[in-house]
Every structure is written in C-alpha cells, then in structure tokens.
Amino acid sequence: MKKLWQNCHIATMQNGQYSYIEDAAIVTEGHLIHWIGKQQQLPADTYSETVDLNGAWVTPGFIDCHTHSVFGGNRSVEFEKRLQGVSYAEIAASGGGIASTVRATREASEEQLLNSALKRIRCMQQDGVTTIEIKSGYGLNYENERKMLRVIRQIGEKLPMTVKSTCLAAHALPPEYKDQSDAYIEHICTEMLPKLHAEGLVDAVDAFCEHLAFSPAQVERVFKTAQSLGLPVKLHAEQLSSLGGSSLAARYHALSADHLEYMTEDDVKAMAESGTVAVLLPGAFYLLRETQYPPIESLIKHGVRIALSSDLNPGTSPALSLRLMLNMGSTLFRLTPEQALAGITIHAAQALGLEQTHGSLEQGKVADFVAWDIEHPSEIVYWLGGDLPKRVVQHGQEVIF
C-alpha cells in the first residue's frame, strides 16, 4: 500500500547538492520511494495513510560509514590520563590503548557486546542515522573476530537500520603474534578471512596501514585475499604518516580510504581516477588534537568525493552524534554545510557501495529519510546539540524511540 508524506520541503542530496524541492511530497510503497516531487504535481491516487509533516525539511537518512561501534569496556580513564600529560605511547606501553579494548572485547560475551552496542547505536538513530557500517578489529583472532561480526549481524536484525559489516582483523598486532606481523597477516589471509566470509559475516574488508600497524605490502596481501573472495576493500590510511596507503587503496579500487591527514597530491590524483571516496573523521582529529589537516582543497579540486563519519570507537573518537561531526567537518575542515551533508548522505552511501539504493531521495530508492524542525538544511550543520529530528523514517516506516 502507498503512504503519502506531504507538506514538506526536501533536500534530496542528488549529485552531492541540496537539490531542493519546496512545497513537496513523498509517496512511499513498501520500503521504497514510489514518487517524489512538488505537492501540486502529486498524481491522483489512493493512499493507505497520509502524514502531514507540517512544513518540515526532509533529508535522506544519515549514513555513518566508518564506525567501531562494537567493543568491550571503554577508555575514559585513559582519556583522563592523556589530559594529565601522559602520552599515548606511555599508555600503550603500560597495557592500555587498543590492547586494553582487545582484552575487554575478548572477555565480553556476545550478549554483553550486543547490549552495549545497541545502547550506543540507538543514540545515533535518534540523531537521524538510518544506515551504519560497523567494523570488527578488537578480537584479532578467529574466535573473537567472528564473535564481533556475529554481533554486527545481530544489530541489523534487532534494529530498524541498514547495517554493513567490515572485517578489520588487520587492525593491530595481537599479543600472541608479538613481533610476528607477517605471520599474523598470513593467518588472516589463509584462515580468518576465508572462514568468516564463508559464514556470510563479511560485507567488506579493511586494514590499518601505518607504522604502528601494518605496511603497504602487508595490506596488499590482505587486499589480494579479499579480492579473491569477491569482497570490496577499504583502508585506514595516512592518518599519522605518509605511506602511500591511499594510492594502494586506489589501485585496488577501494570503496574508500579513511583519515587521510598525510596524503599527497599523487594520492589524491590516484583516488580521483579510481573513484575511491575520501572519508574524513573529524572526531579523531579533534580528540587527538591533530595539526596536520587532510588536503581538502586538493580533494575538491580533483573531484574526489568526500564523506564524513563519526569513527565511533572507545579510544580516539567516542562520538555518539553524527550531527556533531557535521559541525566539526565544517568548522575544522572548512566544508560548506552542503558539502558536509553530502558527506553523510550520498557520498557516505558511495563509501559503502550503496549509492544505487541509498544516500539521496529519488524515485525507486530506499525510503530512508528524516524530517527536521528547521528553516533551512544548513541548520542541521549549524546547531550543536538539541533535539532537531521530528521523525526518522526507515524503509518507509517511522521509527519509534
């Protein structure tokens, strides 16, 4: 049956622009958009329900395309230590940092991981998020990576959201492989990835290319394995140094390369040629008090699509608000509100390979949208906090919180 959503204004975000339709209406049928346009051009039809949006602005549902939402414990004590002047290296040397999250995640049951993640993600839903990507990477062995990926699948079953899973086994070196990074990469490629993929738990494969993680050559082995399994790839690249990770990602036609503070002009050109999306993570940039900015002007000049994401994780971006990331993206990286909104809608969809079905409001696409009590879409980026969404609609059905 068809449902009519009327008396609204729409920022469709087609082609990465507001692409306004004022005095508009949307007709949904099942989980899809059946018709969208000016209300005065609405075709005569019969509707099972009519919803008056009372002049609200409507945007596509938000897409958080890079998160680590499933983890055990938190690192608030480390946050306090860093503020007292203790370095990340000192924290890591004392058993903190990612190692502490790996321990807590390994110790947690599936049920504990699921319940804690659901609390976090429900906060994000209320901010307008209708699609989320979640990475593994705190298990670092087959049993616990599998546990994380199973939890991610369960989140997609429990919540009215689109949930994509990414295997990030190549996130850090587990303690049992100390000083044996090549052996761990071999284990990922010959044991973990094939088994996890065979169980239907993996939508994409990611890795962390950095001096403190894995080299470009090691990452390439992971990419080749993913490619042989028919899985798309993504990459944490150029966050702390320039290793050419983003160019490597481009060579493998990665969906995205993420962070990118230290990428070069050649990296930008390679990503532009491959169509790889640049995912910027202002939350981590802010919390780590970084000073090296991603090359925004170069990315825009060469036509690289820019997405924004929360990078929700317990160590460097405990961010539960994607709307806050919008403001940070504009304030820190000087993106316009229009560019920032494109970064969590159509460009974020492209970073997940979902642009044909998600990310903009068009006939035939999935009916994920948010109605806002605002006078212009730029207000979504402008306001810090507050309860702006009037309605969150997922697959044509209003989400009740």
From Swiss-Prot:
**In terms of one coarse class, where is the protein primarily found?**
cytoplasm
Where, per UniProt, does this protein localize?
A: Cytoplasm
User: Cofactor binding mode, per the note?
Assistant: Binds 1 zinc or iron ion per subunit.
Recorded GO CC terms: cytoplasm
Pathway, per UniProt? Answer: Amino-acid degradation; L-histidine degradation into L-glutamate; N-formimidoyl-L-glutamate from L-histidine: step 3/3
Picking any one GO molecular function of the record gives:
imidazolonepropionase activity
GO BP, sorted A to Z: L-histidine catabolic process to glutamate and formamide; L-histidine catabolic process to glutamate and formate
| Alphabetical list of InterPro entries matching this protein | Amidohydro-rel, HutI, Metal-dep_hydrolase_composite, Metal_Hydrolase
Locate the residues binding 4-imidazolone-5-propanoate.
R75, Y138, H171, Q239, T316
Pfam families, per the entry: Amidohydro_1
What cofactor does its activity depend on? Zn(2+); Fe(3+)
Looking up SUPFAM superfamilies in the UniProt record yields: Composite domain of metallo-dependent hydrolases (SSF51338), Metallo-dependent hydrolases (SSF51556)
Which residues does Fe(3+) bind? Answer: H66, H68, H236, D311
Keyword annotations of the record:
Cytoplasm, Histidine metabolism, Hydrolase, Iron, Metal-binding, Zinc
Q: What is its EC number?
A: 3.5.2.7
Output the superkingdom of the source species.
Bacteria
Which residues participate in N-formimidoyl-L-glutamate binding? Y138, N313, G315
- Quote the catalytic activity from the record: 4-imidazolone-5-propanoate + H2O = N-formimidoyl-L-glutamate
- Quote the PANTHER family the UniProt record gives: IMIDAZOLONEPROPIONASE, IMIDAZOLONEPROPIONASE-RELATED
Function comment: Catalyzes the hydrolytic cleavage of the carbon-nitrogen bond in imidazolone-5-propanoate to yield N-formimidoyl-L-glutamate. It is the third step in the universal histidine degradation pathway.
Q: Give the UniProt family note.
A: Belongs to the metallo-dependent hydrolases superfamily. HutI family.
The record's listing under NCBIfam families reads: hutI
Q: What is this protein called?
A: Imidazolonepropionase
Task: Give the originating organism.
Answer: Acinetobacter baumannii (strain AB307-0294)
